[in-house]
Design a protein with these regions (language model features):
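Ligand-binding pockets and gating/stacking loops
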Residues: 1-249
């Protein structure tokens, strides 16, 4: 058991299924370096994020989806930028792929108007041929990562739309998570995370903004903003823990 805020009534029922990490400390007080320290182990740019290390070490179980996926919500971006899910000095193929909870989860996942699959494949093959020639000349390993990323992008156009469409989930699942397909929300991303894990994505890390509760506006104030954020996460994270367990994940 553990003490839980009264603003997380659903979560309080499953605390025995959760690990609490209390041994962390930091001398970083600004947002960006603190975010980098937490995600990469160092307060300066250039180190791989935790998801990159896991994917580098363990690989992925699904060759048609990235091994490291980053659903984002909250309407803002980290102060440290994409470095919080970057690959640092590892090949860029291990960096996180950002997903949104509204609109197309991944930008440019659909073929442009007037381009069919055969034409898209031919264009990627042509680009990769140029990259292969460039690699033969310069032997830069990052060129190989670029080739892999183009191939992954093509595969994702087939696999991603189905996996990332939460609208086809049963009604009881939407009720359990509190999801509303088509609208930007943390809950939608939590359900998406479960679907991605089911499909063999090795590392899924959710980022949600709006927790800096010391501003002057109502949504930034501790009395209002903090309670609202708790309300947004309480039901869905509880559902995720329960759902993963019942599916043997």
């Amino acid at each position: 058991g553990a003490w839980v805020s009264e603003h997380l009534p659903h979560f309080s029922k499953i605390v025995d299924e959760v690990s609490f990490l209390k041994a962390c400390s930091s001398d970083q007080f600004n947002h960006a370096p603190a975010q980098l320290l937490m995600q990469t182990g160092g307060a300066r740019l250039g180190r791989p994020s935790i998801g990159s290390w896991v994917t580098y070490g363990l690989g992925t179980e699904n060759q048609n989806l990235p091994g490291f996926v980053v659903p984002t919500s909250g309407g803002k971006f980290p102060d440290a930028g994409k470095s919080v899910w970057g690959s640092g000095f590892l090949p860029s193929v291990y960096q996180g792929v950002q997903c949104r909870s509204e609109g197309d989860p991944v930008l440019f996942i659909k073929d442009p108007a007037g381009m069919d699959r055969d034409l898209r494949k031919a264009s990627i093959d042509a680009i990769n041929k140029v990259n292969e020639d460039e690699y033969k000349e310069y032997k830069d390993p990052e060129i190989l990562s670029r080739i892999s990323q183009y191939e992954m992008a093509y595969k994702m156009q087939i696999a991603a739309p189905e996996v990332m469409d939460i609208s086809k989930e049963p009604e009881y699942i939407h009720e359990m998570y509190g999801t509303k397909p088509g609208k930007e929300s943390f809950a939608n991303n939590v359900l998406l995370a479960r679907k991605l894990v089911e499909k063999g994505v090795r590392f899924v890390q959710l980022f949600d903004w709006g927790w800096d509760s010391h501003g002057a506006g109502s949504e930034d104030a501790l009395e209002i903003g903090f309670k609202n954020k708790c309300r947004q996460i309480d039901k869905c994270i509880t559902a995720l823990i329960f759902d993963l367990k019942q599916r043997g994940l």
